[in-house]
């Protein structure tokens, strides 16, 4: 245990043009995302973000909270989103929700914002 605690994991730099993976998570009070790269079969953390909900954001439906986590990551990690293909890994049908013709309001605006990046979705 002492050895593990005395050697914290290091953040790994990304390589130009490589595919990066984004894990998004939602709780009752916050959203978070971890941007990782695959290096020889092991994943290395590049960046981690989290953001607490403010005001009415707590009342978003679960799928909107997940989309909010993705757009928050895109805002904070814009240089990575511009330079790399981002593969979003989630257990929810986020791609279908973002590209649905019934998507209105925030979801439609976020989908338009994300369309400028090379984002792929994998469940």
Language-model segments: residues:
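Amphipathic alpha-helical
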Residues: 1-12, 117-118, 123
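Short coil/turn segments at secondary-structure boundaries
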Residues: 12-18
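Two-metal-ion RNase H-like nuclease active-site motif
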Residues: 18-27, 70
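A glycine-rich phosphate-binding loop feature that marks nucleotide/adenosyl-phosphate handling sites
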Residues: 18-21, 86-94
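Amphipathic alpha-helical blocks
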Residues: 27-28, 111
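Acidic, metal-ligating active-site segments
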Residues: 28-37
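A short, polar/acidic, helix/strand-boundary loop motif
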Residues: 41-68, 72, 90-96, 104
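Metal-dependent nuclease catalytic cores in nucleic-acid-processing enzymes
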Residues: 63-83, 107-118
């Amino acid at each position: 245990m002492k050895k593990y605690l005395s050697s914290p994991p290091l953040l790994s730099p990304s390589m130009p043009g490589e595919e990066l993976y984004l894990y998004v998570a939602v709780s009752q009070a916050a959203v978070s995302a971890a941007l990782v790269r695959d290096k020889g079969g092991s994943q290395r953390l590049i960046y981690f973000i989290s953001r607490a909900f403010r005001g009415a954001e707590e009342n978003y439906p679960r799928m909107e909270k997940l989309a909010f986590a993705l757009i928050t990551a895109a805002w904070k990690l814009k240089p990575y989103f511009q330079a790399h293909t981002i593969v979003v890994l989630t257990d929810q049908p986020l791609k279908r929700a973002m590209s649905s013709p019934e998507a209105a309001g925030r979801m439609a605006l976020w989908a338009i914002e994300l369309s400028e990046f090379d984002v792929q979705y994998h469940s």
